[in-house]
Amino acid sequence: MTTGGFDLGGLDIGALLAQAQSVQNQLEAAQNQLAESNFEGTAGGGLVRATVTGTGELDALTIAPEALEDTDAETLADLVVAAVKDATGQARAMQQSLMPQMPSLGL
């Protein structure tokens, strides 16, 4: 097939555009699903809990009162970081699990 002097090799532009629109719609649905999801990470046997959104934004941080009694500041900071990393890791895993479901355009 030639268009304006270019050989498109039988490429169906209409089908390609329809497939691109379908991929865009699926990507938007996946992004919405992530935006509505929350992921909780824990550290120190549950002494510290962090909740992040599907986009990785920290939404909540809970520190058990006993963590304040029995833990020095440096250890507590390490537990907070570990809980946040746990939660963001779960969000990232969900993001990656949704992306392979996206069809390719077959170019």
UniProtKB/Swiss-Prot annotation:
Its main location: cytoplasm. One of its GO terms (cellular component) is bacterial nucleoid. GO terms for molecular function: DNA binding. InterPro entries: YbaB-like_sf, YbaB/EbfC. Pfam families: YbaB_DNA_bd (PF02575). Keywords: Cytoplasm, DNA-binding. It is found in: Cytoplasm, Nucleoid. The keyword Transferase does not apply. Homodimer. Belongs to the YbaB/EbfC family. Binds to DNA and alters its conformation. May be involved in regulation of gene expression, nucleoid organization and DNA protection. This is Nucleoid-associated protein PPA0205. It comes from Cutibacterium acnes (strain DSM 16379 / KPA171202) (Propionibacterium acnes).
